[in-house]
Regions:
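Internal alpha-helical scaffold of NAD(P)-dependent oxidoreductase catalytic cores
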Residues: 76-85, 101-139, 150-177
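Aromatic-residue-lined binding/catalytic grooves and analogous aromatic/hydrophobic interfacial grooves
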Residues: 147
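Short acidic-hydrophobic, aromatic-tinged amphipathic segments that line or gate anion-handling sites
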Residues: 24-29, 130-131
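NAD(P)-binding Rossmann-fold cofactor-contacting core
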Residues: 1-18
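Conserved beta-strand segments of alpha/beta enzyme cores
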Residues: 3, 22-24, 85, 127
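Rossmann-like NAD(P)(H) cofactor-binding subdomain of soluble oxidoreductases
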Residues: 11-12, 21, 29-104, 108
């Protein structure tokens, strides 16, 4: 954590993140980009354009840009960042508890060492699956991205139904799981 810089335009949120996890904090995306070996873009797709514009021209040659933004294609990332060493990834919701699977792909500029870094970073959320063609990213997003949330929602509804029928919540959970 002492080598990680979190960039957030909201100082209170960024400072809290820094204090909670022992990270360095900056409000400047360009400052983070200039210092990064690996720059993780973990923002909503609708703000990605603004974020990419703020780092364009600030990335060091050979640094890795790792995107976790849904639906943002590698060409868009490369053009927007002015950089070619790009990984696009799509984690799913169970990754929040380390039980997910993240599908990822990268450009030919990504070195073997950077591929290993990617596996290590994304592996913190569970399993990883590398695909060599970006077309599989969109397919995986449809299949895997939010799909598990619907399964959990259905499980919660079944548990509620069990409670409604007279089971304790604990017993209903055991029956459903």
């Amino acid at each position: 954590p002492d080598r990680i810089i979190a960039a957030d335009p909201h100082e209170d949120r960024g400072r809290q993140l820094g204090e909670s996890y022992g990270l360095h904090f900056t409000r400047s995306n360009s400052e983070a980009a200039e210092a990064a070996d690996v720059l993780v873009l973990s923002v909503k797709p609708q703000v990605m354009g603004k974020v990419m514009a703020s780092i364009k021209g600030h990335l060091r040659p050979g640094s890795l840009v790792l995107s976790i933004a849904a639906g943002v294609r590698i060409k868009v990332l490369s053009d927007g960042c002015g950089h070619n060493c790009i990984v696009r990834s799509m984690p799913n919701t169970p990754g929040q508890i380390g039980q997910g699977i993240t599908v990822w792909t990268g450009t030919s500029d990504v070195s073997d060492e950077q591929r290993q870094w990617t596996e290590d970073i994304l592996g913190a959320m569970g399993e990883t699956l590398y695909v060599d063609d970006e077309k599989f990213m969109d397919m995986a997003t449809a299949l895997n991205g939010s799909g598990p949330s619907y399964v959990f929602l259905l499980m919660e509804a079944l548990i509620d139904a069990g409670v409604h029928l007279g089971f304790s919540r604990q017993d209903a959970q055991r029956l459903v799981q």
